[in-house]
């Protein structure tokens, strides 16, 4: 009561405030009634609509902010919103027919064409092409044919033939790849932004990639399968580099990753990661985090290629199928969330037929678009 005996003026609480949302519930109700004048509209319909729109807006703004950050821009533009929508599968399906003003367009490049352009410059193609050329020159019957066609044409033909072989291998999921320097490319998959995933049958210590991944424990133990292989190939220099890293870094936490120089190895760097044990608390999330941390370290060094073993499926006890699914899921989501990545090729270095079959099968399930 006021001093004059009248009632206090009570401030009206809006429907949005009552529902706990920011978007205007009353306006949503008017929009729904305009479109459906013959139907009765429930009280909860505009509230639910406002909540959904608010959630979608926040999601798009978060992804657009990540795109602006990755492109080193301080302000979110319509272009970043377009990229955010295009790189999220659900949002892309929802807003497929929506035009974003001043957002530009996304080039519709077929993944195979993109892979050919990048593959001709990549290290893997450079490794694959020499052996067939040597085989073609070694027989006495094929030498005059090479002279007639010319060096450049012969090289182009050999590249085309090898491309057909690799495509057949990836399509049929067989072990008929292109054998080169002790390893065979069994299957290739291109992701949305052009990164290539390749299943390779070989020893991880023999591949000439920018980085190889070494699954270890908190003390940087090198007694596992991958650690033993790298230690034999790298020798004392590799062991000393690991010891120095252990002193500088200290114990390696679960899902953590640290990098050292690849002394004595074809690879430039070795990324040591501490993967979780199967059955531990949140082991699946931690395995995904382990893979993403390895990729982030490679991106920090501006590396273009990285080779993974089957992390977690050895002594840590992960089922091979589960480990493959989690690793591929982590890699795919990493490249979607990180708009600008220096990594162009990811190798999976496998040696047993069971792991090879699982990775080829799981890679075929990934959507290249």
From Swiss-Prot:
Tissue specificity remark: Widely expressed, with high levels in testis. Present in liver, kidney and adrenal gland (at protein level). In the liver, present in hepatocytes and at a lesser extent in cells of the bile ducts. In the kidney, expressed in proximal and distal convoluted tubules and in straight proximal tubules. In the adrenal gland, present in inner cells of the cortex and medulla.
Basic residues compositional bias, start-end: 144-160
Macro domain: residues covered: 184-367
Subcellular location(s) per record: Nucleus; Chromosome
Residues carrying Phosphoserine: 170, 173
Region (Disordered): 128-180
Modified residues (N6-lactoyllysine): 7, 9
Posttranslational mods: Monoubiquitinated at either Lys-116 or Lys-117. May also be polyubiquitinated. Ubiquitination is mediated by the CUL3/SPOP E3 complex and does not promote proteasomal degradation. Instead, it is required for enrichment in inactive X chromosome chromatin.
Record cross-link Glycyl lysine isopeptide (Lys-Gly) (interchain with G-Cter in SUMO2), residues: 123, 167, 189, 320
Residues recorded with modification Phosphothreonine: 129, 178
Residues binding a glycoprotein, per UniProt: 203-204, 226, 275, 312-314, 316
GO cellular component: Barr body; centrosome; condensed chromosome; nucleolus; nucleoplasm; nucleosome; nucleus; pericentric heterochromatin
Modified residues (N6,N6-dimethyllysine): 123
Function: Variant histone H2A which replaces conventional H2A in a subset of nucleosomes where it represses transcription. Nucleosomes wrap and compact DNA into chromatin, limiting DNA accessibility to the cellular machineries which require DNA as a template. Histones thereby play a central role in transcription regulation, DNA repair, DNA replication and chromosomal stability. DNA accessibility is regulated via a complex set of post-translational modifications of histones, also called histone code, and nucleosome remodeling. Involved in stable X chromosome inactivation.
Protein name: Core histone macro-H2A.1
The organism of origin for this protein: Mus musculus (Mouse)
Gene from which this protein is expressed: Macroh2a1
